[in-house]
From Swiss-Prot:
Positions in coiled-coil regions: none
InterPro entries: ATP_synth_F1_ATPase_gsu (IPR035968), ATP_synth_F1_gsu (IPR000131), ATP_synth_F1_gsu_CS (IPR023632)
Function of the molecule: Produces ATP from ADP in the presence of a proton gradient across the membrane. The gamma chain is believed to be important in regulating ATPase activity and the flow of protons through the CF(0) complex.
Name listed for the protein in its UniProt record: ATP synthase gamma chain
Gene Ontology biological process terms, A to Z: proton motive force-driven ATP synthesis; proton motive force-driven plasma membrane ATP synthesis
Organism per entry: Clostridium botulinum (strain Hall / ATCC 3502 / NCTC 13319 / Type A)
Topology in the lipid bilayer: Peripheral membrane protein
Lineage: Bacteria, Bacillati, Bacillota, Clostridia, Eubacteriales
Gene Ontology molecular function, alphabetical: ATP binding; proton-transporting ATP synthase activity, rotational mechanism
A Gene Ontology cellular-component term: proton-transporting ATP synthase complex
PANTHER family in the cross-refs: ATP SYNTHASE GAMMA CHAIN, ATP SYNTHASE SUBUNIT GAMMA, MITOCHONDRIAL
Length: 282
């Protein structure tokens, strides 16, 4: 009996040891990717924040009617969801999906979805939520190429009045252990009252530049979401894998203890049988 128990524990120790090797390796890879993602995030954040200030000034000085400010009359809402292509990143993806579900459940008929990432596509398919477009296999360091493709699709849907409001749903990165799901409205723009005496002269007129300004702003905004999402994903995966490695270490300690106790018991029993046999032969 003891022999069978020892064999079973040995198998479990081998299995947990192999799993620990995988989780430790994935944790190290995620740490390296997170470091790279954070550098990329800081660079993109500076560009995005500067462009946001410029756009705010431009929007406030446009006096003519413009669908990107006044709206286009459509009641449809578009949600662009940023998820990951890979799993094993804790609650990163499910938190985003839950926020989207809570947002659209009151008005499903007027809610449309574009999903980024294999995991988001999989979750939405299980929930029976149809998508307008799907973007997968996004590189670890997203570029303006990926952002531009999505930006052009958003502009096309909005300018053709297929959607009247556009929201980006993504995970804002604060630290490896703290991320927050945000739902950011990007269209139509919100015009603020002029609070200073700033005067801006445009040549050519800003109305002629609006399409280009809009596309560049959406690229910057989407790239910022990508950068936050990648940092959040790798931070969540690093935390999850480090936690799994710690749990594997604890489990191995317990299994080693069980193994040693069982082996000691088997040795004691064997000695007792030998002594008992010797006594019987006297």
């Amino acid at each position: 009996m003891a022999g069978a128990g020892l064999i079973g524990i040995r198998r479990r120790i081998k299995s947990v040891t192999n799993i620990r090797k995988i989780t430790k390796a994935m944790g190290l890879v995620s740490t390296a990717k997170l470091r790279k993602a954070r550098v990329n995030l800081e660079i993109n954040k500076k560009y995005y924040n500067e462009y946001k200030i410029i756009l705010k000034d431009i929007i406030n000085f446009i006096e003519d009617s413009n669908i990107y400010i006044d709206g286009n009359g459509s009641h449809k809402k578009l949600y662009v969801i940023f998820t990951s292509d890979s799993g094993l990143c804790g609650s990163f993806n499910i938190n985003i999906i839950n926020n989207v579900i809570n947002e659209i459940k009151e008005d499903k008929e007027n809610s449309l979805v574009i999903v980024i990432g294999q995991k988001g596509r999989m979750y939405l398919k299980k929930l029976g939520i149809n998508t307008l477009a799907e973007y997968i296999e996004i590189p670890d360091v997203p570029t303006t190429k990926e952002a531009g493709t999505i930006a052009k699709n958003i502009i096309k849907l909005y300018s053709s009045k297929e959607v009247g409001e556009v929201f980006l749903v993504y995970s804002e990165f604060y630290s490896p252990v703290k991320q927050q799901v945000l739902i950011n409205k990007i269209l139509p723009f919100t015009k603020e009252n002029k609070s200073d005496n700033k005067y801006i002269e445009f040549n050519p007129p800003v109305t002629q530049l609006m399409d280009e300004i809009l596309e560049n702003y959406l690229k910057a905004t989407i790239l910022n979401c990508f950068s936050n999402s990648k940092a959040s994903e790798n931070g969540s995966r690093m935390t999850a894998m480090n936690g799994a490695t710690d749990n594997a270490n604890d489990l191995l300690d317990n299994l080693d203890l069980q193994f040693n106790r069982l082996r000691q018991s088997a040795i004691t029993q064997e000695i007792s049988e030998i002594v008992g046999g010797a006594e019987a032969q006297r």
